[in-house]
Design a protein with these regions (language model features):
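Bacterial N-terminal signal peptides that target proteins for export
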Residues: 1-8
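C-terminal segment of classical bacterial N-terminal signal peptides
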Residues: 14-22
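Boundary/entry segment of secreted carbohydrate-active catalytic domains
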Residues: 24-73, 101
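Aromatic-lined carbohydrate-recognition surfaces of secreted/lumenal glycan-active proteins
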Residues: 29-39, 96-104, 167-191, 206, ...
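Aromatic-lined substrate-binding rim segments of carbohydrate-active enzymes
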Residues: 52-55, 63-103, 110-115, 145-173, ...
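An active-site-proximal structural segment forming one wall of the substrate-binding cleft
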Residues: 109-135, 152-165, 189-202, 266-280
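Active-site groove signature of glycoside hydrolases
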Residues: 120-150, 174-180, 204-218, 285-293
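Substrate-binding cleft of secreted/luminal carbohydrate-active enzymes
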Residues: 213-216, 244-324
Length: 324
């Protein structure tokens, strides 16, 4: 017969080990990814390396620096890239890219990968350790540009991911898709269907999911909401799929057409998006600050008025909480 004291001692020991294990488990902190505007043949990206002292404070808050693979191919020499990747190692910055998986210039996953693989190999030869790639909206491209079915998008995206996993097995692979042009339910269905197809192929599923939110449409068109988006974040977390959110100046193009946009528009817009999502307790796993709209006009310094790195610095100070 087991005596009561023995049971009590065993229970106490189990509880102590349970508490200790959870106390020792480190919290996964949110990360900051940045991609500066690409105008003037990627001048802003080049400035980050040629003027490193002008963004030291911001750099300490950044985890991942990225741009498009095509931008690296077009704009920068091998000598520049070799030097920059060395600097990134010294700064403990990870390197990532946005890439095509289904595009008008590559309508199948195999075709896209065949065109991009030489770009990536060139970067690796220059010293890059490619941490992650994010596929640039294959579902959107399939629907809106090559006019194929969602089933086609699933199959060709899965084919692309399979190629990446085979040739670059250590690389994280995520997907970017648009909201609110696709509903929350459509996003959930897309993720589940794509991951199931990958599983059927014996290929690891998505490593993260990134939302490109045209949040101006929430009020201008009454389509979508931060509340609904927060539900997608929760759903991803339940699926143990890291959720990333792009922060950008959604209203900049419309303001520019009306002669209302300047560099302050970028800054105030991403801060507004930060407040809007934080005020409903939105907490993405990665805060992705990215400009593809040619603004702001200056990347540096990070204490300058309305510069890109200033916006990153102030945003990260305000919204990126490492205890979340």
């Amino acid at each position: 017969m087991i005596r009561f004291p023995t049971i009590l001692i065993a229970a106490t020991a189990w509880l102590a080990s349970f508490v200790a294990a959870h106390a020792q488990a480190p919290k996964v902190r949110p990360t900051v990814w940045i991609s500066p505007p690409g105008q003037e043949k990627g001048r802003a990206f080049r400035d980050l390396f040629e003027r490193p002292d002008d963004w030291k404070e911001t750099r300490a808050m950044v985890d991942v620096l990225f741009a498009t693979d095509l931008g690296f191919q077009r704009n920068y020499s091998d000598e520049e890239l070799t030097r920059w990747f060395g600097q990134m190692r010294d700064w403990n910055l990870k390197f990532a890219m946005e890439v095509g998986a289904i595009k008008e210039w590559g309508k199948t996953g195999a075709e896209c990968f065949a065109k991009e693989q030489p770009y990536w190999q060139r970067l690796q030869k220059a010293g890059a350790k490619i941490y992650a790639i994010a596929m640039d909206e294959p579902l959107v491209c399939t629907r809106e540009h090559i006019h194929e079915s969602d089933e086609y998008a699933v199959e060709e995206t899965a084919n692309y991911v399979a190629q990446v996993r085979q040739h670059f097995p250590e690389m994280l692979v995520g997907d970017i898709e648009a909201y609110p042009s696709s509903s929350v339910e459509e996003h959930e269905h897309w993720i589940e269907t794509l991951n199931k197809r990958l599983a059927d192929k014996g290929v690891r599923g998505l490593d993260f999911y990134r939302l490109d939110v045209d949040w101006l449409r929430f009020n201008a068109q009454g389509k979508g909401s931060w509340k609904d988006l927060r539900e997608l974040e929760r759903w991803c977390r339940q699926k143990k799929l890291p959720f990333q959110l792009i922060y950008w100046a959604s209203g900049y193009p419309a303001a520019s057409k009306r002669g209302l946009a300047d560099d302050s528009t970028w800054y105030t817009a991403i801060m507004q998006q930060g407040y809007d999502y934080a005020l409903i307790d939105g907490k993405p796993d990665a805060y992705v600050i990215e400009s593809w709209i040619g603004a702001p006009s200056q990347c540096l310094p990070d204490n300058g008025e309305w510069t890109f790195t200033r916006s990153v610095r102030d945003f990260a100070r305000k919204f990126v909480k490492h205890d979340q």
